[in-house]
From Swiss-Prot:
One of its GO terms (biological process) is zinc ion transport. It is found in: Endoplasmic reticulum membrane. It comes from Arabidopsis thaliana. This is Zinc transporter ZTP29. It is a multi-pass membrane protein.
Length: 276
């Protein structure tokens, strides 16, 4: 392993492990109530939607054209929709929630809380997968930036580190709420960030020449479709259920604004020939 590879790997670790910092904000605070959980789920939904549409899908359109990018994007949507058909998912309608609690009393309330936690855990695991898929190409970007020069690599790694803190929150929050385990929340958030150094290793060793830029951009467009689907199918319903539609929508747009600002400053750190 040459020195350039070691530098890129170290920088990607700095950027990737900042998800752990976001997780610390969650695990060092008290377990949120249901409304707070809904607001934070809405915030995380905004983060995910911005990544999907303003980052991954946008770059795919610019790189391979509108038609091909849309084929990849909706291919990702269909692919993940098919997967969710075969994954057992706890469903819970907000309209029946209160009626069941009144009918069954305390025991019913405990049963409903268990279902809530299962549903939130499912959402958290899907979020962790989506964030990992998003972090993977960021590791590739750090590697390519490091090749360009140390200054570019360092600036890019620091920008990604700031960019990844709210992603750590998005992963750790539902895991902590569902499992009540600080370790599980911290561990999964950290693992999602480790996709970045993994991206460095893979792009350096496995795909130095074989993976064409068009295929890579298409795959990232498909990742955007996957993330958009899981946000609209899994995360937003939870946010509406727990926080109410009006408050959840505000949280969504606040999350979108935060991630958009993060993507903007991240873009400023990239050389002119690169984009995320």
């Amino acid at each position: 392993m040459d020195s350039q590879m070691l530098v890129a790997l170290g920088l990607s670790l700095v950027g990737g492990l900042s998800t752990s910092l976001g997780a610390l904000f969650v695990v060092l605070s008290e377990t949120p109530n249901m409304k707070m959980l809904g607001l934070l789920q809405g915030f995380a939904s905004g983060l995910m939607l911005s990544i999907s549409f303003l980052d991954l899908a946008h770059n795919a359109i610019n790189s391979i054209g509108f038609f091909k990018a849309n084929l990849w994007f909706f291919g990702g949507v269909i692919f993940f929709a098919c997967i969710t058909k075969f994954i057992p998912e706890p469903t819970l309608g907000p309209s029946t929630d209160g009626k069941r609690r009144k009918k069954n009393g305390d025991e019913g309330g405990k049963d409903m809380m268990k279902k809530h936690r299962k549903q939130v855990l499912y959402s958290g695991l899907i979020t962790a997968i989506g964030i990992s898929l998003h972090n993977f190409p960021e590791g590739m970007a750090v590697f390519l930036g490091s090749i360009k020069g140390m200054r570019v690599g360092v600036n890019l790694a620091l920008a990604i580190a700031l960019h990844n803190i709210p992603e750590g929150v998005a992963v750790a929050l539902p895991i902590y709420f569902a499992t009540e385990s600080k370790w599980q929340a911290f561990k999964l958030a950290t693992l999602s960030g480790l996709a970045e150094p993994l991206g460095v290793i893979i792009v350096a060793y496995l795909f130095p020449r074989s993976l064409s830029p068009e295929i890579l951009e298409g795959l990232l467009g498909a990742v955007g479709g996957i993330m958009a689907f899981l946000t609209l199918h899994e995360m937003l319903p939870l946010a509406f259920d727990y926080a109410g539609q009006k408050q959840a929508v505000k949280a969504v747009f606040f999350g979108m604004a935060c991630m958009s600002a993060s993507l903007y400053f991240l873009e400023l750190s990239l050389p002119e020939t690169m984009s995320l």
